[in-house]
Amino acid sequence: MDNMTMGAKNNRAVNIFVVMLCQSFQTVSGAGIAHFLPSIRSNLNLSFTQAGTLSAATIFSYALMQIPAGYLADRYGLKRIFFIGVLGTTALCLTFGLVPRYWHALVNQTASGIFHALLFQAGLALLASWFGAQRRATAMGLSLVGIFAGQLLINALGPWLVEHFGWRFPFISFGFVGILASFIYLRLGQESQDTQSREKLRIADALRLFRHRFMWVCGIIQYVRLGVMQGIAFWLPTLLIDEQGLALQVTGSIIALRTLLIAPSNLLGGYISDRLKRPTAVMGISLVILAMTTAALAKVNDVALLIALIFINAIFIQFYFGPLFAVPVEKYGTHMAGTLSGFGNFFANLGAFTFTYLLGALKDQTGYFESGFYAMAGACLLGLIFTVLLEGMRRH
């Protein structure tokens, strides 16, 4: 019995590890584009608006695929959909390093969003399936640790690679390693018994969620969450380099430390939510702090104070990720985990599309990021209002 128990624990650990390994490549391409944007803009001759559309195109196709990806994962098997998502994402990361002009880059990133959705939805459900119901927010938060590990690596190693080999090399090298990781998962990865025994969903089950006011409230908060997250993540390097005059290496160090703070804070938020059984309290506190720090980022000129604000903002920007994804599963059940996360992430990526494009367009119009950061701070206050509404709905 002890040997069987030990074997089950080892099997669980291996599966969690290979899923997180593959998840680490999900946003490498987007993080690299944001970090090396000045070099990419110069080489491909892009305006700020065009640069913003590279991120917006990925987010738009990613958003449209959220519910279909969740449904496909629940209907046809998490392992199969996850492998397709990882392989497609990493292959397109590699080929982004080969694009000769803007339109090629735009098509590449649009296609990338489709595979990102498959990777994210299946990966989120795979991790959740290896944890019990009492640790659901922690499990869902764990998925971001893998994602941010990839961002941390490209932000830490990328500037050195760009300096010695040019901006294309990080995409080619990370993409190649990611393709290898996808086949490691294919060889070692398994689905838990929970996922293998689940009832297959119908399309009508997924579409029926649009009738539920509870899901619309969660969706609006998701819109704010990723809108603010992606708006800051994509444009912060440009803010530091173009408006604050920091060097690429210094900016890379700041972004890497910021990423290093996000991953554990996300886990901590999920843990606190699970222990206290107060997910909306975690969400509300996070949104208040984000509103204040995001607004302050637009006005502060002192570099030391700006860096402190960036780090405080980073601690709370995904602090409520796990609780927000866990609340719908708490209400509707684990058999719909992929579809529920797809619904929430559809709204989340509409927010990300809105703010990445909006900040680029406002930068072109005004020459500064100030108005864009104020808009994100206002969105945080809107999210706070809907969090209060969500708590009332949970109580009843």
Model regions and ranges:
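Helix-loop-helix hairpin linking two adjacent transmembrane segments in secondary transporters
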Residues: 142-189, 235
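Conserved MFS/SLC helix-loop-helix module at the cytosolic interface between two early adjacent transmembrane helices
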Residues: 64-103
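Paired small-residue
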Residues: 88, 92, 103-111, 304-312
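C-terminal transmembrane helical hairpin of 12-TM major facilitator-type secondary transporters
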Residues: 279-327
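Cytoplasmic helix-loop-helix junction between adjacent transmembrane helices
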Residues: 108-147
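Helix-to-loop junctions at the C-terminal end of transmembrane segments
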Residues: 65-77, 266-277, 363-364
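Cytoplasmic membrane-interface "Motif A"-like loop-to-helix N-cap segments
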Residues: 75-85, 274-287
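Extracytoplasmic gate region of multi-pass secondary transporters
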Residues: 33-35, 213-266
